[in-house]
Every structure is written in C-alpha cells, then in structure tokens.
C-alpha cells in the first residue's frame, strides 16, 4: 500500500491541489481537473484576470469542482493514515508556513487556495485571518523541510520539462506592489525566478 511507503506528502502551489487528489485516492482526478476540465471550462486566462482580478477562476476550482462538478472525497482524505502538508507563503513574515488539516474541509480549501495564489495575478488569500500567497515563492521544493522533520528518504515530483534550467534574473518589483507587506516584497525579490506566471 502507498501508505506503507509514503508516510507523508508535501504539496506546493498546484502540487497542493494534485496532492489532495492523491491523498483521497481518487485516481485520475488531478489529470481530469487539470487537462480535461480545463478544455471544457477554460478556468485560466486574462478574462478572469480582467473580471475578477484573478487569472484563475477560483470559484470554479475551489467550490464548483470539489462540491459539484468533480466531487472531492473529503472523508477519504480525512481518514487516510498519511500526513499531508500544504505550503503557503506568509505575507507578513515572508516565510513559508506549513499546514496540516484533516478535520475542517473549509480550512483545507482556504489552505490549498492560498498555496495556489500566484503573486501578481491572483489576489492574496487568507488562512486563519493571515494573508498568504503561493508557497512556491519561498519553498517551491520543500525537501529541506522534510529532512528537518526526520524524513531521510524523499521522492520529489516536479512539473518541469526535461532539461529545464532556471534563469537568474534581476527583476525589480514596482514600489506599489505589496507595499503593505515588506517581508513579502523581500521574499519575491529573492525568489521571483521560481514563480511560474
């Protein structure tokens, strides 16, 4: 059984969404929502950015999909023996926050929404009243966190094309962007090349 091999998973950004489908053992759900339903519902695009100030249709992704269109099995997730951690970036501290939630489905949605909130093109999301953005800003591959937590053998699943190499870019953030969150601005300045917009 998978739980005998992988006692804990960590999901970041879109990986947090995919990880939830894995944790509920809904085989094919992540592929169906990311490929098949994208073609049908076109939930990514400039029309959403112009209409809702969000490049992704979060209402569709985090309400309609899990509740109606592609029902998510919360109970299977809550009952799974493995631990599941979702990573966000805390706008106040500019550091990663690591969340485990296996009781409250609304909080699960708040966390995965925050983990998937890309900077610049998605609004800030809130978890427990704290402003959050995409976990990939500061910990896109949380391998060190897993090692720190005592997991010596780790498997990393990346969504990169073969041969991908990160470019070093010196990108300046305009002064009006996230001006209320100086620590977030610092984090974005350090790691902007890791964000996939």
Functional labels for PLM-detected ranges:
Residues 194:
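ATP/nucleoside-binding phosphotransfer catalytic cores, i.e., glycine-rich phosphate-binding loops
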Residues 183-191:
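Mg2+-dependent phosphoryl-transfer enzymes with acidic/Ser/Thr/Gly-rich catalytic loops
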Residues 1-68, 100-113, 158, 162-171:
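Patatin-like phospholipase
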Residues 81-182:
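Active-site gating loop/helix substructures
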Residues 69-83:
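A short alpha-helix-loop-beta-strand transition element characteristic
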């Amino acid at each position: 059984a998978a739980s005998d091999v992988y006692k804990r998973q960590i999901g970041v950004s879109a990986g947090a969404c995919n990880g939830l489908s894995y944790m509920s053992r809904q085989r094919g759900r992540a592929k169906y929502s990311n490929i098949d339903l994208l073609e049908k519902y076109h939930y990514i695009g400039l029309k959403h950015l112009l209409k809702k100030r969000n490049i992704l249709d979060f209402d569709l992704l985090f309400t309609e999909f899990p509740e109606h269109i592609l029902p998510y099995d919360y109970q299977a997730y809550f009952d799974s023996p493995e631990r599941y951690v979702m990573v966000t970036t805390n706008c106040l501290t500019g550091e990663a926050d690591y969340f485990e939630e296996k009781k409250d489905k609304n909080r699960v949605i708040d966390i995965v929404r925050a983990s998937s909130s890309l900077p610049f093109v998605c609004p800030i999301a809130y978890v427990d009243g704290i402003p959050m953005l995409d976990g990939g800003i500061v910990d896109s591959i949380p391998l060190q966190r897993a090692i720190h937590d005592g997991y010596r053998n780790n498997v990393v699943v990346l969504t990169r094309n073969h041969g991908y190499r990160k470019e070093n870019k010196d990108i300046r953030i305009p002064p009006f962007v996230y001006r209320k969150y100086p620590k977030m601005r610092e984090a974005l300045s350090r790691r902007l090349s890791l964000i996939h917009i």
